Design a protein with these regions (language model features):
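Nuclease catalytic cores that cleave nucleic-acid phosphodiester bonds
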Residues: 73-206
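Domain-level signal for Mg2+-assisted phosphodiester chemistry and nucleotide/NA-binding surfaces
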Residues: 1-103
Length: 207
């Protein structure tokens, strides 16, 4: 794992690609429940961080997501909010198990690489199987790579000797409240309560 602060020269591009399905799944697993508004990432804060990272260079922010049949009305406000703060959105129908957007993310990174002005890639994902090898190849080509995500799940980036890593919660303003991240691996000496994932009364609900 390397440091992530890389000053950019004028004309260079810093590209953020955000794997929405993977990040949503990781956050839900971390919380043990569907996140409330306090625990949903603020993309305006992510955008400001990206602009600071790009300096005088070009900052490009893209979110890649799947849209399942029947969910259009639920997803539309979120997509419009992203576009309103300067993020481009690549939306793909989730019609089969093979409708993932990993290959689309890699295709877009490759497109920008071929254009010749790509200085740094920031990938928001914990999917090491899809991204570790291609991202390390970018580093060998002289492009800086940073992964942002949750340290509990983005272990591939932390284990890499050439990929930078930044925990999403370390970026100023991304979360309105601290995430409840107490785990068995991070217990204080005095011990800590681990809250239930659901109400005890849910045992009475019909499955």
């Amino acid at each position: 794992m390397t440091d992530v602060e890389v000053p950019q020269s004028p004309g260079s591009r810093v590209l953020l690609v955000w794997d929405a399905p993977n990040m949503d799944m990781s956050l839900g697993s971390l919380l043990g429940a569907r996140p409330t508004s306090a625990y949903r990432p603020r993309f305006d804060a992510v955008g400001r961080w990206l602009l600071e990272l790009a300096g005088e260079g070009v900052a490009e922010a893209c979110v890649f997501t799947n849209v399942t049949p029947g969910s259009t009305e639920v997803v539309r406000p979120w997509v419009e909010a992203l576009r309103n703060v300067g993020f481009a959105v690549f939306a793909k129908p989730k019609v089969t198990d093979d409708s993932d957007i990993d290959s689309d993310m890699l295709d877009h990174i490759e497109l920008r690489r071929k254009e010749g002005d790509l200085a740094q890639v920031v990938v928001a994902s914990g999917d090491g199987r899809a991204f570790r090898s291609p991202l390390e190849a970018l580093v060998r080509d002289g492009i800086d790579v940073t992964v942002i995500g949750f340290r509990e799940y983005a272990t591939f980036a932390q284990a890499s000797e050439v990929i930078g890593f930044r925990d999403l919660e370390e970026i100023d303003g991304v979360f309105r409240e601290p995430l409840p991240r107490m785990t068995l691996d991070s217990l204080p000496d005095e011990g800590a309560w681990l809250q239930p994932f659901r109400s005890l009364r849910s045992l009475l609900e019909k499955r």
